[in-house]
Amino acid sequence: MDKPRLQAAAKNVRLKASLPGTERAISIAFAQYGPRDVAFVSMETGLKTFDVTDLDKPKLLDHLTKEEMALPGDDPTKRFWENEDINVDPKRKLAFLAREVNSFGRALPGDRPTGNYIVSAVDPADLKILSFHRQNTGHTSTCINDCQFLWTAGLDRSDAKTGRIFVTDIRDPKTPKELPVSVDVRGKAGEGKITHDVQVDAQGIAWVAGDDGTRGYYTQGWHRDPLSGKYREAKAWDPVAYAGGGVPKADMPTSFTHNSFRPIGRTLDDGPRPTRENPAGSLLLHTEEAFGSPTCKTEGRFVISSLQGTHNGEGWGEKPKEMKTVGIWSPDDQEGTIPGNVTCSAHYFDVQKRIVAYSWYNQGTRFLDISNPAKPIQIGYWRPDTATSWAPYWHRNTVFVADISRGVEILELEKGAYDAQASGTNVTLTEHHARELARESDREPVPLAPNPFYGWACPMVANRDDSDCGVGACGAPC
């Protein structure tokens, strides 16, 4: 059955601008250059930089092309994949691009290099590759300890085949050095469990998402190690367990977390209001990426968990403790949601002033008020024609959305969204299921398929015989 072409739907959100030439955008980061704001857009075609100081007139600065990124043996006509969560060193002006196993048409039985490109963006209008560091994974890479180290997550392609984080010393970005350690090991050798991504909170805790839940680590300073009972110094290559664990199956059936956010310190006001029941720093917001119903009715949802009772190592070991679920949300039965043969899962999100901007693939970008963590409410949504919303990013009271079908769109919330937040009003139709009808359109959503290595835990654009993604360009057969 073909995917329906989706009728556009939006409420309390308006389109401010678009970044030209950003179709197949995957992830975005920002950096300050004096008075200038620069956006880094990672795409299947490489890396683009834009001057977005004037949001009404964004200006392309440079394009590091996939042809420039191609390694010996690559087919440069095929796509770069995936760098799902680009990181930028704001001080040294370095960009980090994680390379997956199926980039540039690589397939078995041939060699399939994975690892990280380190790109100099000292001049954002003149991007230069400093190095490519090959290692046995390459899905996402995250700056640790002021970008002196990288934690890289993904499928472990070494003989161990355990879920783990790879640690790279990038103090010299021209000669990165992988350290002989395994961080956040998940499962036994050969089980094929994975880590997926790392987010660092405002306290410096590094949160690792993947199979069996989300766990946090100190990477600096002296702390009591709950796994040994001893006080020791935390390091990027030898972190100290902090808190976290699994999620009840009823709330997250796959037990696979995709990304997370813990509001604390300077970001505390971005998260739910602290209460006696849920004090400051005790909540963890995270995504289950899973594809069940077209409306995410029972899986692939947004989950808010309590970290209380997990600070003594309870979330580690063969049977990690499950965190208490505080709240859950999905687009099911929400205004702006379309039924039928469409792709739905929670994906990346970003938080500002208690509002979550959230990507849900074909169900678009949703805006949720999380003031009450037990009851998130939808205050606006943006589900344009052919939406395949990948990741949203708050930037100066606007939201940049990386949509792999439409490119990067810059959105603004309208007054109605803030009024709904102030009054606690959910923009849900109560008389009947608030769903939009499919109709014919001039545009068609990008087809998605399960990743040959991660399955539906991390889908990819399906093989298509066209100029953007030719037959075989998307990796192994799905």
Predicted regions and their residues:
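Secreted, short cysteine-rich peptides and small extracellular cysteine-rich domains stabilized by multiple disulfide
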Residues: 461-478
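Feature marking well-ordered beta-strand scaffolds used for ligand recognition
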Residues: 1-461
